[in-house]
């Protein structure tokens, strides 16, 4: 388990560095990220490289038992580069050229920029690639820029030509006869700005993804050619940010990382947990938090400080969801620059700020020997998966039909009730292998590719339960409407035995009577509603609309399709339900699929999550299961401790568990203080 911070030694005289490193060591830190914005210090003028200062910083850290994550500095090109080569600066959609002096203001597709990126990364890799004090590399920082230059337009046209081969195919897939958009020359195709042809917009998103992947792959290849095999490579992504397809980019990385900031307010674990799950799902591996806030940020409407103890909960919350590393941003704020008031561990006077005390407590816990040993080689392993697709998000966000329709909010609507019930979820690519899951949910999977159709049908035919929500199966892989009603693809419609007869953007909530638990439950649907039609005599309605707009009255709002011979089936939910109805639907799905909660009792605001050793049979000798219990509230809570049978799913008598954070055995009830954490393992 790694714990640390981002440090910028280039901001400070070398005479200060030893004091900083001593404070890191005292805080329990065993890793530090450096270098990712220091290009002008590494290469003050073209081709003149200065790494002695970096060598000194690395040695200071190493001598104090602190490993180094080395960042490539390519998010912040030096002024001499952008001045002499203005073509390296990105062109915004407005036609304005990005200014030097910010970050990520470069054009990632610029051949000139790529040349200089290769040079600096190669110099770093040759110098530090065989250095065992460096455990890994972070490439760049928070990819985000989209370039709209004429050069990018030409490369986009070439990309489309490679993909579609002929203009006839492109025109057909994009329905360009509409509004006389038909192209007779590849050079006629524009970069979409604002609303445009759905096929063109999706194609440009795919192109942007490829640009970033090429940019990243250049750095990956240079480092791998010069680095030790054990030096890993990652990038720090930004949660739900969607300018490119993260699944594509992470294929070339060893694992994914992300930067987690709360901003205004306080953390809601039911919302943040699924972003951890999203990041873990990029590679289906544990992840790192390369940045998280040490108290507050500086860019939110109200940059309030986290409550005392809240950061500890957040740290263990991340670990529970698969984080193997956690670093604060930043160690100390520079006297100048754009982020002067951002939270930090060290103040302007060089002394620890109040947050340093809590960070030290967190560090002592995360890096304690018994904790590290217990968490080693463990990861979250779940029975429920939620599917996620950038293509679907792009498709819906370009044509929401109701501006209140947010595909990420729909995903969270389905994930939150599981978090409240101590049931973890995996968030997977829509084309992922689904073997081993009891329940798959596809929230607003509007665009379904042939590969996804094959995966989903195989899953149901193999006995799985698949939930398709509103807007599933509207479009094909080119962002064109399927020539059939939802769920679109014939294979899915045949399995479902249900189709969407019509969809409605709602201006007012409509009544929905839910019957899935055997008794009517009065609820509502809002934003979006679909009128379902049962195609199979074996399909059954699970909910009906009440009197509303006349079009929905009395029609099915949810339905379960016929069971396949394997026992699998598809369930269609045609409404965005109110919270109480969503909760009751979740309970019904759990009962239908036999999903087992990580902890049988639940208390509002208390999270229970587990990490396990993959491949170990529950309860078998050598199996390792670590349970994280977090009180996210400011009140004392009590949580009954279950018997061993609740941990393994089998029979068993009352059992004893050890809290690794206190060294004490847990009694029959966990007494949780405000913002308290328990790390439980089975006692000998």
Predicted segment positions?
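Polysaccharide-binding and catalytic clefts of secreted carbohydrate-active enzymes
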Residues: 94-255, 259-272
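The substrate-binding groove and active-site-proximal loops of carbohydrate-active enzymes
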Residues: 3-13, 37-52, 99-118, 140-147, ...
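Carbohydrate-binding surfaces of carbohydrate-active enzymes
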Residues: 186-189, 229, 239, 250, ...
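Short, solvent-exposed turn/loop segments enriched in Gly/Ser/Thr/Pro and often Arg
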Residues: 8-10, 35-38, 71-80, 135-144, ...
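Short, acidic/polar
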Residues: 12-25, 117-123, 238-249, 307-315
């Amino acid at each position: 388990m790694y714990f640390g911070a981002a440090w910028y030694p280039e901001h400070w005289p070398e005479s200060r560095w030893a004091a900083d490193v001593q404070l890191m060591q005292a805080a329990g830190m065993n890793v530090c990220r450096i270098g990712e914005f220091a290009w002008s210090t590494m290469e003050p003028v073209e081709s003149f490289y200065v790494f002695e200062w970096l060598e000194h910083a690395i040695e200071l850290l190493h001598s104090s038992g602190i490993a180094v994550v080395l960042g490539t500095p390519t998010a912040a090109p030096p002024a001499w580069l952008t001045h002499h080569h203005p073509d390296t600066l990105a062109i915004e959609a407005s036609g304005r050229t990005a200014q030097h002096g910010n970050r990520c203001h470069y054009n990632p597709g610029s051949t000139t920029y790529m040349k200089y990126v290769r040079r600096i990364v190669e110099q770093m890799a040759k110098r530090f690639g065989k250095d065992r004090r460096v455990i890994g590399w972070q490439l760049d920082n928070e990819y985000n820029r989209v370039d709209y230059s004429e050069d990018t337009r030409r490369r986009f046209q070439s990309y489309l030509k490679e993909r579609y081969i002929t203009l006839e195919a492109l025109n057909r897939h994009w329905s360009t006869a509409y509004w006389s958009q038909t192209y007779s020359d590849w050079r006629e195709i524009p970069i979409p700005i604002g609303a445009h042809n759905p096929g063109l917009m999706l194609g440009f998103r795919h192109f942007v993804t490829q640009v970033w992947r090429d940019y990243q792959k250049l750095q990956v290849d240079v480092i791998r050619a010069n680095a030790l095999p054990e030096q890993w490579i990652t990038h720090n992504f930004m949660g739900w940010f969607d300018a490119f397809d993260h699944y594509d980019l992470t294929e070339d990385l060893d694992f994914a990382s992300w930067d987690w900031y709360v901003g205004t307010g306080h953390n809601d674990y039911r919302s943040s947990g699924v972003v951890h799950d999203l990041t873990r799902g990029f590679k289906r591996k544990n992840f790192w938090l390369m940045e998280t806030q040490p108290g507050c940020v500086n860019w939110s409407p109200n940059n309030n400080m986290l409550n005392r103890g809240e950061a500890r909960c957040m740290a263990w919350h991340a670990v529970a969801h698969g984080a193997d590393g956690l670093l604060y941003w930043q160690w100390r704020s520079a006297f100048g620059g754009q982020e002067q008031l951002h939270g930090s561990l060290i103040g302007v006077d060089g002394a620890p700020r109040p947050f340093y005390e809590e960070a030290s407590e967190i560090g002592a816990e995360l890096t304690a020997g018994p904790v590290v040993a217990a968490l080693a080689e463990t990861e979250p392993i779940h029975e429920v998966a939620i599917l996620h697709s950038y293509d679907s998000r792009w498709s819906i966000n370009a044509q929401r039909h109701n501006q209140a329709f947010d595909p990420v909010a729909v995903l969270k609507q389905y994930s939150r009730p599981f978090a409240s019930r101590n049931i973890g979820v995996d968030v997977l690519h829509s084309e992922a292998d689904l073997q081993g899951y009891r329940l798959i949910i596809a929230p607003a999977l509007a665009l379904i590719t042939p590969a996804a159709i094959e995966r989903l049908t195989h899953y149901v035919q193999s006995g799985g339960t698949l939930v398709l929500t509103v807007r599933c199966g509207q479009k094909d892989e080119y962002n064109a409407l399927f020539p059939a009603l939802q769920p679109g693809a014939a294979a899915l419609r045949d399995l479902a035995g249900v189709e969407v007869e019509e969809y409605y953007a709602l201006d007012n909530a409509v009544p929905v009577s839910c019957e899935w638990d055997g008794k009517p439950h009065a609820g509502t649907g809002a934003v979006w509603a679909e009128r379902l039609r049962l195609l199979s005599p074996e399909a059954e309605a699970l909910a009906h609309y009440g009197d509303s707009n006349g079009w929905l009255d009395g029609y099915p709002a949810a339905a379960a399709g016929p069971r396949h011979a394997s026992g699998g089936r598809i369930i269609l939910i045609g409404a965005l339900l109110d919270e109480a109805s969503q909760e009751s639907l979740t309970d019904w799905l759990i009962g239908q699929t036999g999903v087992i909660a990580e902890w049988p009792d639940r208390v509002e605001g208390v999270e229970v999550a587990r990490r396990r050793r993959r491949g170990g049979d529950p309860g078998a000798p050598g199996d390792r299961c670590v349970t994280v219990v977090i009180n996210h509230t400011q009140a004392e809570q009590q949580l009954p401790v279950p018997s061993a049978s609740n941990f393994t799913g089998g029979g068993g008598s009352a059992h004893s568990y050890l809290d690794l954070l206190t060294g004490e055995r847990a009694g029959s009830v966990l007494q949780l203080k405000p913002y308290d954490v328990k790390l439980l393992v089975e006692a000998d």
